[in-house]
């Protein structure tokens, strides 16, 4: 490991690579990735409100891409606004007043007027998946293993469930290659479902195919009026659609079987 001008040697029985989308560990392990470019950039910033947000999160689907606002402390919200790259560049370059006016037009007045906005950044949106997430003694988790579009806000939650499952596998099976094989089997369904859901939402809400607008509206109407469908979607989004790690259920780790 490089530390300034020095090189430090660290020995470990297991390396958990959680070093993000552009994982250097993945590069050093010479492992492949599958990349899908969504041809969108995400604008991120903190936005201040004039009235309380009530700890509610919001998402709007605009013609250019989804716009999400997540509650923070002191009546601030974290903004993630996906847009076409050229439009994102234009929005980032606006002064604060003009940016807030554009945001207000896109989002509406459900939260009242936006009062201020912090420094804005943008980054390209892409799906990055590792077909092989382990190479003993290394295991990849979170964005290093699977970077998703932020449309459903599930990337961070998915990474937490990776860690919860890995901790439980280590607790019950020790540090060995067979433990990592077991971990991969446990995580496969959850990762596949959330990846499919996220990618499907992007195609659904960005497609310009004839009749797709009607299909979107009917789908949202069904989701809003059929509790069983809404509950099923929420269950998968929370990680309860398959085998759920104990830590996700707030159960302390044990040495019993997890299968």
Regions found by a protein language model. Give the residues of each.
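FAD/FMN-dependent oxidoreductases across multiple families
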Residues: 87-177
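A generic short alpha-helical patch detector that favors 3-5-residue windows
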Residues: 35, 71, 133, 158, ...
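C-terminal helical "tail/cap" subdomain of flavin- and related membrane-associated enzymes
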Residues: 168-259
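A structural signal for well-ordered alpha-helical scaffolds and beta->alpha junctions
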Residues: 18, 22, 40, 62-63, ...
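Hydrophobic/aromatic residues within well-ordered alpha-helical segments
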Residues: 73, 95, 99, 103, ...
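Hydrophobic side chains within alpha-helical segments
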Residues: 44, 157, 164-165, 193, ...
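Conserved FAD-binding catalytic core of PHBH/FMO-like flavoproteins
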Residues: 2-120
């Amino acid at each position: 490991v490089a530390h300034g001008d020095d090189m430090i040697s660290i020995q470990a029985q297991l390396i958990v690579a959680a070093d993000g989308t552009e994982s250097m560990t993945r590069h050093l392990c010479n492992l492949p990735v599958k990349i899908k470019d969504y041809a969108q950039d995400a604008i991120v910033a903190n936005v201040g409100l004039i009235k309380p947000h009530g700890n509610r999160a919001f998402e709007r689907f605009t013609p250019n891409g989804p716009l999400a606002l997540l509650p923070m402390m002191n009546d601030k919200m974290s903004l993630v606004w996906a847009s076409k790259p050229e439009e994102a560049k234009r929005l980032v370059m606006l002064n604060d007043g003009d940016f807030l006016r554009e945001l207000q037009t896109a989002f509406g007045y459900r939260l009242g007027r936006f009062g201020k906005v912090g420094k804005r950044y943008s980054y390209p949106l892409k799906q990055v998946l590792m077909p092989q997430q382990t190479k003993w003694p290394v295991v990849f988790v979170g964005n290093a293993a699977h970077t998703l579009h932020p449309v459903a806000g599930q990337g961070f939650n998915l990474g937490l469930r990776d860690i919860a499952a890995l901790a439980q596998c280590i607790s019950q099976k020790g540090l060995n290659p067979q433990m990592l094989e077991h971990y991969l089997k446990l995580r496969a369904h959850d990762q596949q479902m959330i990846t499919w859901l996220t990618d499907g939402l992007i195609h659904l809400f960005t497609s310009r195919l004839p009749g797709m607008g009607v299909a979107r509206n009917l789908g949202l109407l069904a989701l809003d009026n059929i509790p069983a469908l809404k509950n099923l979607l929420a269950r998968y989004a929370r990680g309860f659609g398959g085998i759920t790690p104990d830590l996700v259920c707030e159960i302390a780790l044990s040495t019993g079987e997890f299968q």
